[in-house]
């Protein structure tokens, strides 16, 4: 079954590929830190001293240690961008750099 690519997939994939350190805040207030090792539709594998599988429904917020710029129009047809200005202090992530999986069951590694 194919699906419209969400904002989650390109964002998490950029964090994974760039090995960006992240702080993951859970809905119960716990803060986890590490790097996104892999992810699928339901969970994220977070690597620090050990690997942790975190279910997405338990996540409140993901905060990257550095800025990640996404080109939303390439991934989300519902996003309307009024201007295409680039912020030179933000990393550019281009659609051809991202591996978007059409199959919901695939894990990105």
Swiss-Prot record:
Record carries keyword RNA-binding: yes
Matching Gene3D superfamilies: 2.30.30.100
GO CC field: cytosol
Disordered: region residues: 77-109
Domain called Sm: residue spans: 9-68
GO MF term list: RNA binding
Entry-linked InterPro entries: Hfq, LSM_dom_sf, Sm
NCBIfam families xref list: Hfq, PRK00395.1
PANTHER family the UniProt entry points to: RNA-BINDING PROTEIN HFQ
Protein family per UniProt: Belongs to the Hfq family.
Known function: RNA chaperone that binds small regulatory RNA (sRNAs) and mRNAs to facilitate mRNA translational regulation in response to envelope stress, environmental stress and changes in metabolite concentrations. Also binds with high specificity to tRNAs.
Assembly and oligomerization: Homohexamer.
Protein name as it appears in the record: RNA-binding protein Hfq
Organism of origin: Francisella tularensis subsp. tularensis (strain SCHU S4 / Schu 4)
Lineage of origin: Bacteria, Pseudomonadati, Pseudomonadota, Gammaproteobacteria, Thiotrichales
């Amino acid at each position: 079954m194919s699906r419209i690519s969400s904002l989650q997939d390109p964002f998490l994939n950029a964090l994974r590929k760039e090995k960006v350190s992240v702080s993951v805040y859970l809905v119960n207030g716990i803060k986890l830190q590490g790097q996104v090792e892999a992810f699928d539709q339901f969970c994220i594998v977070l690597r620090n001293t050990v690997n942790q599988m975190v279910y997405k429904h338990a996540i409140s917020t993901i905060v990257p240690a550095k800025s990640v710029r996404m080109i939303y129009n390439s991934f989300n047809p519902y996003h309307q961008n009024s201007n295409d200005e680039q912020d030179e202090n933000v990393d550019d992530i281009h659609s051809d750099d991202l591996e978007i999986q059409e199959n919901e069951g695939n894990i990105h590694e």
